[in-house]
């Protein structure tokens, strides 16, 4: 399962063939910028909330790594959702990649 952040979705013309999901905040960010690809991807992209327990783990790891101030709340939910679904994060955000690496969450760079 791929867990996509906003940067991954903004950079794609089509979704990966692998099953993909994202937190609701990512959808809100794309909607804010009137990205019409959501109209095409709506049925293919699973939208899921993360658990509070996973958010706590991400917050603690981000504090330890020094990335807490660089991660948006949506970034943190991407990482937490990856924990919940045992997924691989797809992003170009260095802070997300750094916290994912520290936490042992698989991560792939966009592009």
PLM ranges: what are they?
Residues 1-87, 94-107:
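Active-site-proximal, substrate-binding regions of enzyme catalytic domains
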Residues 111:
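Cys/His-rich short segments
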């Amino acid at each position: 399962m791929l867990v996509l952040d906003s940067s991954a979705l903004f950079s794609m013309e089509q979704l990966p063939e692998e099953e993909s999901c994202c937190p609701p905040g990512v959808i809100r960010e794309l909607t804010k910028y009137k990205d019409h690809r959501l109209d095409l991807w709506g049925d293919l992209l699973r939208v899921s909330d993360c658990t509070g327990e996973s958010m706590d783990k991400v917050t603690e790891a981000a504090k330890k790594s020094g990335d807490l101030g660089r991660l948006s709340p949506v970034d943190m939910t991407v990482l937490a959702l990856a924990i919940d679904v045992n997924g691989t994060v797809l992003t170009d955000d260095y802070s997300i990649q750094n916290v994912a690496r520290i936490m042992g969450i698989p991560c792939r760079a966009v592009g």
